[in-house]
């Protein structure tokens, strides 16, 4: 699987197909049973690229301030491709955990608004914390936070690094090739194909925002 002949097994690529065929043969030789008569399953995915018209503007006391992509904000790969506007509402870490009697959305109305949250979880550097991310990575991950925001009716999400736990407040979002000098231009992110109406704009913002 690490052979140079597979050329890194990029997704998709002939090298990845060769690796899949090899793994299927190993499964067969090991006596495993195929699922539904096949050693592989189809997963529909798509590559996405950052568009040319991304913009973020905040209006405070009637004054508009436009921010620069990369320096001030970077969209996540899970973002929706649409224009939204609305009031900003802060919702902590955007976590709802009934078993921990913790809910950042308790008493917070984000319906029709853009929710602002911190990345990660409370006390993220404390391994003894009940929010320990190693045990709850799926629950506190971005996908879970976006899903929770949508369930509460938010139309968009701005994400920040929590300043007490992060020395850098530089926006990261997703390492888009078009914003990087070191990432190959064809190294576009891949996501499962989904209806864009099920998404909301999700943007990582920096200190100036």
Describe each PLM feature range.
Residues 70, 151-164, 168, 176-209:
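Long, well-ordered, tryptophan-enriched scaffold segments
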Residues 125-136, 142:
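Proteins synthesized as precursors that undergo proteolytic processing into mature forms
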Residues 1-9, 194-196:
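Acidic/histidine-rich, surface-exposed loop or edge segments in extracytoplasmic proteins
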Residues 7-128, 170:
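Noncatalytic luminal/extracellular "stalk/propeptide" segments of secretory-pathway proteins
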Residues 14-26, 38, 141-148, 153, ...:
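Extracytoplasmic/secreted proteins, especially bacterial periplasmic and envelope-associated proteins
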Residues 1-2, 42, 88-91, 114-118, ...:
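Structural recognition of the beta-strand scaffold that forms the well-ordered cores
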Residues 9, 13, 135, 199-203:
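Hydrophobic alpha-helical scaffolding
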Residues 131-133, 172-177:
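Short secondary-structure boundary/capping segments
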């Amino acid at each position: 699987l690490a052979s140079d002949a597979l050329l890194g097994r990029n997704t998709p690529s002939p090298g990845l197909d060769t690796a899949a065929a090899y793994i299927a043969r190993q499964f067969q030789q090991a006596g495993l049973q195929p699922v539904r008569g096949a050693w592989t399953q189809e997963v529909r995915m798509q590559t996405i690229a950052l568009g040319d018209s991304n913009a973020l503007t905040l209006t405070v006391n009637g004054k508009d301030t436009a921010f620069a992509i990369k320096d001030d904000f970077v969209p996540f790969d899970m973002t929706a491709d649409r224009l939204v506007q609305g009031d900003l509402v802060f919702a902590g870490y955007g976590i709802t955990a009934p078993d921990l009697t913790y809910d950042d959305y308790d008493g917070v109305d984000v319906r029709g608004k853009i929710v602002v949250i911190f990345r990660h979880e409370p006390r993220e550097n404390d391994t003894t914390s009940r929010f320990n991310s190693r045990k709850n990575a799926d629950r506190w991950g971005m996908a879970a936070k976006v899903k929770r925001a949508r369930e509460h009716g938010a139309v968009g999400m701005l994400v920040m690094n929590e300043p007490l736990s992060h020395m850098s407040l530089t926006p990261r979002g997703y390492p888009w090739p078009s914003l990087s000098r070191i990432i190959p231009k064809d190294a576009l992110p891949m996501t499962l194909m989904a209806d864009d109406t099920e998404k909301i704009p999700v943007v990582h913002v920096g200190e100036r925002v």
